[in-house]
Amino acid sequence: MRGRTAWALLALVLAIISAAQAQTPTRETLVQKLQEGTSEERQHAAGVLGDMGDDSAVPHLIDALKDDDEVVRELAEHSLWAIWNRSGDPQINALLQEGIHLIQSDRLDEAITKLDEVVKGAPGFPEGYNRRATAYYLAGQYEKSITDCEAAIRRNPMHFGALSGLGYNYFKLGKPERAIRYFERALDINPNKPRIRSTLIELKRALHQRVRDSI
């Protein structure tokens, strides 16, 4: 009797595990749902890929930034940042999060020092450069910020955050033509940035007026 009960219990446990595995979507399934699913399925896939996705999911999430569904677009952007913030090394990830917290606390010198550790520890990791670029920008060190933005883009050409960062740096340096170029590139990838779009419109208007005044 005890043996039969044990076998029955084992069979039940295996059935539960099998059912749970069947309910857990694979990355491939999520990508397919993101591309071809209903609005609700695309929303779910766009959100879950932030936790389950890796670099292979990035092109599909980039495409989802232009989805007809606003929620899908927002979740896709959130998932992109989640993936981009993961280096594959827990220690580097922790250092990055410390650097981000220091930026948010306006402790910029400390943030730069912390993000130096990220860049030295993971020189191929784009987000280390991008976050340090943000700290440099907020500290008014625009040339250093530009260097880091460019480093991030070399490692991740679709990084709309680093592209818009170049736009803001060149804007601060009084180079509107370059700023416009990078704002447009950022919006080509991620059109869901009203602040960048507004800045771009104002820049183009000011540049047009400057040309008219020079005639």
Task: Give the residues covered by each predicted segment.
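Helix-start (N-cap) detector for alpha-helical repeat units in TPR-like alpha-solenoids
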Residues: 39, 92, 126-127, 160-161, ...
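Terminal, low-structured helical/coil segments at or just beyond the last alpha-helical repeat
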Residues: 98-101, 180-215
